[in-house]
């Protein structure tokens, strides 16, 4: 499957179109406080994340209340993404990004619960490129589960940013969250 993704919104739309499991989130204008309240009333969690909807690797804020959301949103320039934070779900087993292109596997992943998708690149235990026949891949916890998910959903030739948990979570109530798919 050849998917072209240039933005976070295109990634989110593709994730939804492909029926992948993700966290609840909305793309809104920073002044749409009624939509913020409705989202937080619908998805009552301990922790949310607010981030720029139009720029990757941009500033983000963790928030825990509607009032805090409204206040922090004022500091963003335009559209924002309000999402349930993946940190709400406890017991991450493996977090990372993987791309399988032909026989080539590119993987950056960690079991370190202190790392996230932005900080893992500097401290991930698994950060390499190899082929799918490399026997060392079988030593990585949950990689068989991840590979099965990629095959089931035909997520080849694209980077898949994921988090795997010890229990079912997210919009589809599965053990894996797909945080982003990208080729930008």
What residues fall within each predicted segment?
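Nucleotide/phosphate-binding sheet-loop regions of phosphoryl- and nucleotidyl-transfer enzymes
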Residues: 1-184
């Amino acid at each position: 499957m050849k998917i072209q993704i240039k933005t976070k919104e295109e990634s989110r739309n593709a994730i939804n179109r492909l029926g992948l499991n993700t966290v609840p989130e909305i793309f809104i204008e920073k002044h749409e406080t009624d939509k913020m309240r409705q989202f937080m009333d619908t998805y009552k969690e301990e922790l949310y994340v607010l981030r720029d909807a139009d720029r990757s690797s941009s500033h983000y804020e963790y928030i825990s209340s509607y009032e805090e959301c409204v206040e922090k949103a004022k500091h963003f320039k335009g559209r924002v993404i309000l999402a349930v934070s993946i940190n709400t779900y406890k017991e991450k087993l493996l977090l990372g990004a993987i791309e399988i292109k032909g026989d080539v596997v590119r993987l950056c992943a960690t079991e370190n619960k202190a790392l996230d998708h932005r900080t893992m690149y500097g401290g991930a235990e698994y950060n390499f490129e190899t082929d799918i026949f490399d026997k060392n891949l079988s030593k990585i916890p949950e990689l068989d589960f991840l590979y099965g998910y990629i095959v089931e959903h035909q997520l080849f030739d694209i980077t898949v940013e994921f988090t795997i948990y010890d229990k079912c979570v997210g919009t589809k109530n599965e053990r894996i969250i797909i945080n982003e798919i990208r080729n930008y």
